[in-house]
Structure formats: structure tokens, C-alpha cells
From Swiss-Prot:
SUPFAM superfamilies: Zn-binding ribosomal proteins (SSF57829). It is found in: Mitochondrion. The lineage of its organism: Eukaryota, Metazoa, Chordata, Craniata, Vertebrata. This is Large ribosomal subunit protein bL33m. Component of the mitochondrial ribosome large subunit (39S) which comprises a 16S rRNA and about 50 distinct proteins. GO terms for biological process: translation. Belongs to the bacterial ribosomal protein bL33 family. Residues 1-8 form a transit peptide. It comes from the Eukaryota. GO terms for cellular component: mitochondrial inner membrane; mitochondrial large ribosomal subunit; mitochondrion. It comes from Bos taurus. GO terms for molecular function: structural constituent of ribosome. Keywords: Mitochondrion, Ribonucleoprotein, Ribosomal protein, Transit peptide.
């Protein structure tokens, strides 16, 4: 019996870490996770610079989880 080193393709993770950026123009951002199957996130979240809830949009994918 011969054993060989076989490299299998790594499966993609179900969730990804994304960077959310404030649309108020303050430059405030935070990271959150979302499902890989969902469309890009858009949500209301508290921005401490303007001290209000403002719209945050997904800027980029950071990594897979």
C-alpha cells in the first residue's frame, strides 16, 4: 500500500469579516462579520464622532472566518 501526500482544496468559510465605514464623512469605521451568501451590508449604527446613528456601508472584505 502506497501513501502519497495529496493536497485537497480548502473549502470556503461561511462567514467573512468586513469593514463598515460611516457615510457621515467622519472616517469612523468598525469591523463586523456577515455571511458569504448575503449581499453587501448597509446598516444604521452609532457614530461616536457625530453622536448619532448614521448609515454605514461595507467598504471591503478583510478576511474569511
Amino acid at each position: 500500500m502506497f501513501l502519497s501526500a495529496v493536497t485537497f482544496a480548502k473549502s470556503k468559510s461561511k462567514t467573512i469579516l468586513v469593514k463598515m465605514v460611516s457615510q457621515a464623512g467622519t472616517g469612523f469605521s468598525f469591523n463586523t462579520k456577515r455571511s458569504r451568501l448575503w449581499e453587501k451590508l448597509t446598516l444604521l449604527h452609532y457614530d461616536p464622532v457625530v453622536k448619532k446613528k448614521v448609515l454605514f456601508v461595507e467598504q471591503k472584505k478583510i478576511r474569511s472566518l
